[in-house]
From Swiss-Prot:
Its main location: secreted. Keywords: Amphibian defense peptide, Antimicrobial, Secreted. It comes from Xenopus ruwenzoriensis (Uganda clawed frog). Expressed by the skin glands. This is Caerulein precursor fragment R7. It is found in: Secreted.
Length: 27
């Protein structure tokens, strides 16, 4: 559903943002 899509988008956004900031810990 929409909530699932938003959740995935949020996680992807955080991952991309962290990568742009200099790399995030791999989880």
């Amino acid at each position: 559903g929409l909530a699932s899509f938003l959740g995935k988008a949020l996680k992807a956004g955080l991952k991309i943002g962290a990568h742009l900031l200099g790399g995030a810990p791999q989880q």
